Amino acid sequence: YVTVTNNRRKQNLIIKKLKNGWGKPSQRKYSGEDYECISHYFKRNEDENSIDDITWNDLGMDAVFCMMNNTNSSAGQEYLYKMLRCPNADIQSLKKLDKLASDFDKNAAKRLDIQKIFVWIGRAKHISISDYCDVVVGLEKKSNVLHYASMLFILAAVIFTCTISPVLGIWLCIAAIAFSIITYYKYKAAVDRYFICVNHIVKLLMGAKKITALNIDFLGEYNDKLNNISEELSDITKRSWLLETGNVDGSIAEILLDYLRMLTHVDLIKFNNLIKLFNDKEDY
C-alpha cells in the first residue's frame, strides 16, 4: 500500500511539473560531468557545417541549450544538443518542425502523454548513451554455460534434499545458493556499466511502442518509422522484464525479481543474448 501510494504521489508530481514547465525555460542544474556527456553524440557526428566551439561560446549557446532542454531523456537531450550544433537551414524541414511544435502546443493531453513516456525512458546519469551504444555493439557475446550450471546446481541440490538426504541436501542447497550469488556479482560487476545502456536501449524501444500505441494523428509519419524499427528489433524487448528496470521502487515484485536474478542469473543470460542481437541489428 505504501509503495502504491508513493508511486501515485510521484506520478502526480511529475504530471504537475510537466504541465507547469511547458513553454518555460528549464530549471535543471548540470554538473560538469553530465554536461560533457551530453555533447558526445554531436562530437561523433560533427561535420563541416557544425557550429565551432568558439562561435558556440561567443553566442552563449550553452545557456540556450540549458533553457531549452526539457527533453526528459538521455537520447532526447543528446539529440537536442546535436540539433543546435548542426543547424538545419532547409526551409521545408524547419516548417515541418514548426508545425509539429504547433500541433503539440494545441493538443495538451496528447503532449502530456508523450512527455510521460519520455520521463519513463529517463536519463542515464554520468554516461553518454551514444558512447555506450557503440561499445555494446562491439562487445563479444560471452558464454552462458556457467549461468545455466548455477541453476542446475541449485535444482540438483533441491532434488537431492527431497529424495536422498535432507540433512546433507540442506548443506548442498546452501553451497549452491552461495555459489550462484558469488558468481552472479562477479560477472555482474564486469558488465554493470553496459547494463545501463542496454536497459536504456530496451526502454527506448518499449517507449517507441507506447508512442505508436497512442495513435496520435499528426505523428503519422513518425509512427510508421517507429513501427518499422520496433518490428525489426522486437526480439530485443522480449522478456525485457528479466533486466533491471532502473526504477528501484521497493515493491515486493521488484525485490522478488532481484532474488530471482541472483539465484538464476536470468538477467545475465538475457544480457549475453542481447549482445548478439545488437551485433546482428547494428544498422538500426
Language model segments and positions:
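Alpha-helical bundle segments enriched in helix-capping/polar residues
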Residues: 1-284
